Amino acid sequence: MISLKPVTKENIDELLALSIREDQRTFVSTVADSLAQAYVYHETAYPFAVYEDDVIVGFIMMAYYEVKQYYTLWKFLIDKNHQNKGIGKEALRQGIDFLKEKFQVKEVYTGVVPNNAVAKKVYGDAGFKPTGLYEFGMEEWRLDCA
Protein backbone atom coordinates (compact mmCIF):
# COMPACT_ATOMS: atom_id res chain seq x y z
CA MET A 1 0.00 0.00 0.00
CA ILE A 2 1.37 3.40 -1.02
CA SER A 3 1.11 6.33 1.41
CA LEU A 4 2.59 9.78 1.94
CA LYS A 5 3.93 10.69 5.37
CA PRO A 6 5.55 13.91 6.61
CA VAL A 7 9.32 14.16 6.77
CA THR A 8 10.46 13.70 10.38
CA LYS A 9 13.65 13.13 12.33
CA GLU A 10 12.68 9.45 12.38
CA ASN A 11 12.62 9.03 8.60
CA ILE A 12 15.07 11.64 7.29
CA ASP A 13 18.06 9.27 7.10
CA GLU A 14 16.10 6.77 5.01
CA LEU A 15 14.96 9.60 2.75
CA LEU A 16 18.51 10.85 2.28
CA ALA A 17 19.56 7.32 1.25
CA LEU A 18 17.18 7.27 -1.74
CA SER A 19 18.93 7.13 -5.09
CA ILE A 20 18.04 7.48 -8.74
CA ARG A 21 19.55 6.11 -11.94
CA GLU A 22 22.58 7.88 -13.36
CA ASP A 23 20.63 8.96 -16.46
CA GLN A 24 18.06 10.71 -14.23
CA ARG A 25 20.53 12.95 -12.38
CA THR A 26 20.17 15.88 -14.79
CA PHE A 27 16.39 15.86 -14.34
CA VAL A 28 15.82 15.22 -10.64
CA SER A 29 16.93 17.16 -7.55
CA THR A 30 18.50 15.19 -4.73
CA VAL A 31 16.47 14.69 -1.59
CA ALA A 32 19.09 16.71 0.33
CA ASP A 33 18.72 19.67 -2.05
CA SER A 34 14.93 19.40 -1.92
CA LEU A 35 14.88 19.33 1.89
CA ALA A 36 17.17 22.37 2.00
CA GLN A 37 14.63 24.20 -0.17
CA ALA A 38 11.78 22.93 2.02
CA TYR A 39 13.60 24.37 5.04
CA VAL A 40 14.01 27.79 3.43
CA TYR A 41 10.43 27.80 2.09
CA HIS A 42 8.94 26.11 5.17
CA GLU A 43 5.80 28.27 5.10
CA THR A 44 4.86 27.21 1.56
CA ALA A 45 6.55 23.81 0.98
CA TYR A 46 4.99 20.44 1.80
CA PRO A 47 7.56 17.59 1.70
CA PHE A 48 6.53 13.96 2.13
CA ALA A 49 8.19 10.56 2.22
CA VAL A 50 6.58 8.07 -0.15
CA TYR A 51 6.07 4.73 1.57
CA GLU A 52 5.27 1.31 0.19
CA ASP A 53 3.90 -0.38 3.27
CA ASP A 54 6.61 0.43 5.88
CA VAL A 55 9.47 1.10 3.46
CA ILE A 56 10.42 4.55 2.15
CA VAL A 57 10.58 4.33 -1.65
CA GLY A 58 10.39 7.96 -2.74
CA PHE A 59 9.99 11.63 -2.05
CA ILE A 60 7.41 14.18 -3.19
CA MET A 61 7.07 17.86 -2.38
CA MET A 62 4.30 20.25 -3.25
CA ALA A 63 4.52 24.00 -2.75
CA TYR A 64 2.83 27.32 -3.23
CA TYR A 65 4.70 29.28 -5.89
CA GLU A 66 4.25 32.86 -4.70
CA VAL A 67 5.58 34.51 -7.87
CA LYS A 68 2.81 33.00 -9.99
CA GLN A 69 0.33 32.47 -7.15
CA TYR A 70 -0.37 28.80 -7.80
CA TYR A 71 0.29 25.40 -6.23
CA THR A 72 2.88 23.17 -7.79
CA LEU A 73 4.27 19.69 -7.72
CA TRP A 74 7.79 20.90 -6.99
CA LYS A 75 9.93 17.80 -6.37
CA PHE A 76 9.31 14.14 -7.10
CA LEU A 77 11.43 11.03 -7.17
CA ILE A 78 11.06 7.30 -6.74
CA ASP A 79 14.12 5.29 -5.70
CA LYS A 80 15.78 3.47 -8.60
CA ASN A 81 15.00 0.08 -7.02
CA HIS A 82 11.27 0.82 -6.89
CA GLN A 83 10.60 2.40 -10.28
CA ASN A 84 8.24 0.94 -12.91
CA LYS A 85 5.91 -0.57 -10.31
CA GLY A 86 3.13 2.05 -10.37
CA ILE A 87 4.36 3.63 -7.13
CA GLY A 88 5.03 7.01 -8.76
CA LYS A 89 1.59 7.10 -10.33
CA GLU A 90 -0.10 6.48 -6.97
CA ALA A 91 2.20 8.87 -5.07
CA LEU A 92 1.47 11.58 -7.64
CA ARG A 93 -2.28 11.01 -7.26
CA GLN A 94 -2.00 11.27 -3.47
CA GLY A 95 0.11 14.44 -3.71
CA ILE A 96 -2.50 16.05 -5.94
CA ASP A 97 -5.25 14.88 -3.58
CA PHE A 98 -3.37 16.53 -0.69
CA LEU A 99 -3.45 19.88 -2.51
CA LYS A 100 -7.12 19.46 -3.46
CA GLU A 101 -8.16 18.61 0.09
CA LYS A 102 -5.98 21.12 1.96
CA PHE A 103 -6.24 24.09 -0.42
CA GLN A 104 -9.21 23.29 -2.68
CA VAL A 105 -6.97 23.83 -5.72
CA LYS A 106 -8.59 24.06 -9.13
CA GLU A 107 -5.28 23.42 -10.90
CA VAL A 108 -1.78 22.15 -10.15
CA TYR A 109 1.37 23.04 -12.06
CA THR A 110 4.74 21.37 -12.45
CA GLY A 111 7.92 21.94 -14.40
CA VAL A 112 9.50 19.38 -16.72
CA VAL A 113 12.95 19.42 -18.27
CA PRO A 114 12.10 19.49 -22.01
CA ASN A 115 13.98 16.28 -22.90
CA ASN A 116 12.69 14.25 -19.92
CA ALA A 117 10.44 11.83 -21.80
CA VAL A 118 9.74 9.71 -18.71
CA ALA A 119 8.41 12.66 -16.69
CA LYS A 120 6.30 13.82 -19.63
CA LYS A 121 4.74 10.34 -19.84
CA VAL A 122 4.06 10.16 -16.09
CA TYR A 123 2.56 13.65 -15.91
CA GLY A 124 0.66 13.25 -19.17
CA ASP A 125 -0.87 9.99 -17.92
CA ALA A 126 -1.94 11.85 -14.75
CA GLY A 127 -3.73 14.48 -16.85
CA PHE A 128 -1.12 17.26 -16.92
CA LYS A 129 -0.79 19.15 -20.19
CA PRO A 130 1.97 21.50 -21.38
CA THR A 131 1.04 25.19 -21.20
CA GLY A 132 3.61 26.28 -23.77
CA LEU A 133 5.45 28.43 -21.21
CA TYR A 134 9.08 27.95 -20.17
CA GLU A 135 10.81 29.20 -17.04
CA PHE A 136 14.30 28.45 -15.70
CA GLY A 137 14.81 25.90 -18.48
CA MET A 138 11.67 24.01 -17.51
CA GLU A 139 8.51 23.44 -19.51
CA GLU A 140 5.40 24.33 -17.50
CA TRP A 141 2.63 21.70 -17.32
CA ARG A 142 -0.82 22.17 -15.79
CA LEU A 143 -3.42 19.78 -14.38
CA ASP A 144 -7.03 20.94 -14.34
CA CYS A 145 -8.55 19.72 -11.04
CA ALA A 146 -12.00 21.29 -11.47
Sequence positions of predicted segments:
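Structural preference for long, well-ordered alpha-helical segments within the folded cores
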Residues: 91-94, 98, 122
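Short, Lys/Arg-rich amphipathic alpha-helical interaction segments
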Residues: 125-126, 137-141
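Active-site acidic-Proline motif in GNAT/NAT acetyltransferases
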Residues: 79-81, 85, 114-115
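Conserved active-site alpha-helix within GNAT-family acetyltransferase domains
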Residues: 89, 114-132
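Conserved GNAT acetyl-CoA-binding A-motif
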Residues: 100-111
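Conserved beta-strand-loop-alpha-helix junction that forms the acyl-donor binding cleft
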Residues: 109-120, 136-139, 146
